[in-house]
Amino acid sequence: MIEFDNLTYLHGKPQGTGLLKANPEDFVVVEDLGFEPDGEGEHILVRILKNGCNTRFVADALAKFLKIHAHEVSFAGQKDKHAVTEQWLCARVPGKEMPDLSAFQLEGCQVLEYARHKRKLRLGALKGNAFTLVLREVSNRDDVEQRLIDICVKGVPNYFGAQRFGIGGSNLQGALRWAQTNTPVRDRNKRSFWLSAARSALFNQIVAERLKKADVNQVVDGDALQLAGRGSWFVATTEELAELQHRVNDKELMITAALPGSGEWGTQREALAFEQAAVAAETELQALLVREKVEAARRAMLLYPQQLSWNWWDDVTVEIRFWLPAGSFATSVVRELINTTGDYAHIAE
């Protein structure tokens, strides 16, 4: 298995170094649900600003304040503890009376707004996230500047970030032990983390191998292509390659890579043979995913940060702003810019 730090770069290994997250204010995340609260219903959507506390901790504190069980407070995604983050929590509070959430107090946390909503906010139910990152102590401004320009055109690999695999790769190591011993894992969180790490590592490996090709975005026979921003895909045939290539070049279509698991992977012929060869050595992880009935899926191979802009405060400090769809990792963008001295594994998704 390829270590995360050794995965293939789209723009070549960065020439310079830099510091990511010198302080929490250097990593700002604003959650974008993609919808507004209904204004009625048995749930309350609460938009919070937090610094120095993780999402679960705030959710538990909110439940205690509202005198409801912790499982009655949900969220669309975990946000980093060591960052300034803005996100929505959802509390189930039936009844006509609206609690006064302006009285909710928690160090490092502020309620920005709240309103009634008809449906529970479920994990993953967000459109994306807007990021404002500050890279400090940048050693090669010209290289970073050129990379930012190139990323606007060519994007970055849509790798799962190192944080998906746990500190020191602990989640992936857990998956490997589980695969090798076949010992039942009762802890639901561990099961989820380990299976996710296994599938993500296989995806990363497939993408890393594809990026070694001379023309990364060249459609081949049997590729599974996805309409940009959509989840479904279709298979490319030899007769359509020229037309499909044009649509990929226009970013209307995205080439996808496998999230291996049980069932068909989605590619056929040449593309399927390539993907299978890329992870052929990882038989134990593949067998684990099949055994645990994790369904195979697809994910775009490349990621195009939207609304990408940047501002150099001085020759060694740059502020970068961009928006990413749900499930994508800001650290996969930073990885193409600098050899960072920050710790990826401590950054929540």
Swiss-Prot record:
Function: Responsible for synthesis of pseudouridine from uracil-13 in transfer RNAs.
Family that this chain belongs to: Belongs to the pseudouridine synthase TruD family.
EC numbers on record: 5.4.99.27
Record bears the keyword Cell membrane: no
GO biological process entries: tRNA pseudouridine synthesis
HAMAP family given in the database record: TruD (MF_01082)
Classification via PANTHER family: TRNA PSEUDOURIDINE SYNTHASE D
GO molecular function per UniProt: RNA binding; tRNA pseudouridine(13) synthase activity
Active site: D80 (nucleophile)
GO cellular component: cytosol
Annotated TRUD domain residues: 155-303
Pfam family, one: TruD
Source species: Shigella boydii serotype 18 (strain CDC 3083-94 / BS512)
Known catalytic reactions: uridine(13) in tRNA = pseudouridine(13) in tRNA
Signal peptide range in chain numbering: none
InterPro entries tied to this protein: PsdUridine_synth_cat_dom_sf, PsdUridine_synth_TruD, PsdUridine_synth_TruD_CS, PsdUridine_synth_TruD_insert, TruD_catalytic, TruD_insert_sf, TruD_pseudoU_synthase
Keywords for the protein's UniProt record, in alphabetical order: Isomerase, tRNA processing
Chain sites annotated for binding substrate: F27, N129, F329
Disulfide bonding pattern of the chain: none
Protein name from the UniProt record: tRNA pseudouridine synthase D
